[in-house]
Amino acid sequence: GKFTNREISETFHRWNQGELKSFLIGIAADIFAEEDDLADGDIIDKIVDAAGQKGTGRWTSLEALKLGVNISMITAACNTRVSSNDTGRKAAQEVIAAPSVAAVDKEKFAEDLRTALYTAKIMAYAQVFSLYRKASEEYGWDLNYGAIASIFRAGCIIQAVFLNKITEAYEKNPSMKNLVFDEFFLSRVNSGLGSLRKIISLAVLSGIPVPAFVNGLEYIDLLRSPSVGANLIQGLRDYFGAHTFKRIDKEGSFHHDWKQHY
């Protein structure tokens, strides 16, 4: 079920006719269709598999850590670029066993991947706009989130029709705590999570890294889960460092006199 470069290009081109229409999807289609002008074959296969970065993603991740906001998908993207430059990759490929890649129905796979990408894209923007919200509160900026989305719709590499939906969402509810709570985006997340889980499962079983997808799914699962194990973390912190904890049944902060049982 392996896709050729032309098939990948055509897939991106189809996606660029619908709700995923964006500058980056469009030029990705062009890149996979481009022939090499210096040698035989396609130019994509001649480009060294190591990505550079100017620092904006790193700055954003650092600011998010400083403000206590989860933007794990942006950080995962930065880490992937860093890992692509790891000089140990070649040695690892020679000694670490790789699983076999599962066979797939190309048409069904492409549709699941399209849905997974759109779903993950919602989560990525939800993370970033949560960072805007926190920064606005922390620094007294009084940001207009709908206007920010509108600004990105032209003259920017992330320009996409998707941004129109974000503008509409914040025009309806400027104080919305998280983008996924908007009626449109919530509906798309609920309908798309199955495809995202399917693509991630297939990638994991095939040994194919999809860190942004994984972090997007973890983000939404952390958001919707009634318990994430943080009570154990607070218990551990109080046990070794007397950092105190809050209770579900009483107000205030508490420290417990922990006993060693084993």
Language-model features, listed with the residues they occupy:
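NAD(P)-dependent dehydrogenase/reductase Rossmann-like domain
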Residues: G1-Y262
